[in-house]
Amino acid sequence: MKRFTAILLTGMMIFTLASCGKKAQDTPTEPATETQAAEKVEMPTETEAVTEVVTEAAKETQQTEAQQEEQTAEQPDEEQNNSGDNNSSYQYVERASYENGESVSLNPSWQYADHSAINSGCAVMYKATANRKNIVVGVNAGHGTSGGTSVKTLCHPDGSAKTTGGTTGAGATKAVAVSGGMSFNDGTPESSVTLRMAQILKDKLLAAGYDVLMVRDGSDVQLDNVARTVICNNAADCHIALHWDGDGLSYDKGCFYISVPGGIKGMEPVASHWQQHDALGASLIEGLRAHGAKINGNGSMAIDLTQTSYSTVPSVDV
């Protein structure tokens, strides 16, 4: 998992947002402030700056990984016992290889693929043309699946209930396959803004030598949240989902990432990866902070997400 440290802060260097966050609820927000913020996204142009910040993030995260590896070596039996029966179906997989421009569909043999309800669409792989780092960043433009609210999928692979609220309330065992997201007061849907963000992020990542798996490469993709996550699990080294927060506020409350709540940290595959999820999110937020973006509170909000519950690579909603 060392490779994921190199991309921890690449994303944060590339998109400086005025407001982004948890799975957006269908609550309208003030348009002028947020829409203008989307148009004024500032992009760094110096490769040296990107390299410097990525290196700083890598050092911090490598320390976290080293601590995890040391703990695992010291207490293998205890961790195995704590995982329980849920761990028996968990699988580590090698990243699948795809050519530039190749469509990436959901392989029904992939772990958790059978939990998906909408999966006829495809992601698209883009390869950097120079200074390639052999790292694939999964970029997920939130929402943008027509019919996504008409079907539901299991919140957790093991069928257990959600432990926190969100778009779907705590205690539910199923959630809408893909929520519709919020709308700005001028009528612009969240999915349009997240797509533009994803396109900008893709271009900057490619220019910096990172390959990009565009989970949604157009206005609509027939891939639900489970399918998007499973595809990233198998074709990317990390998974970054972009969102705007439907909070109804008329001011910019700042950026934050969705951290993993304690209630699901013992469930696989979360148990094996939640520290990496949170490390990725924290690094993105600290990078945004360093480049002048407003941060909401401590920069995180713990929410039980479908994406996190199914992720086997470092994964975060921002």
Regions found by a protein language model. Give the residues of each.
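Positively charged n-region of N-terminal signal peptides that target proteins for export
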Residues: 1-8
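Catalytic-site microenvironment of enzymes
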Residues: 4, 14, 21-61, 65-318
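Bacterial N-terminal signal peptides
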Residues: 10-16
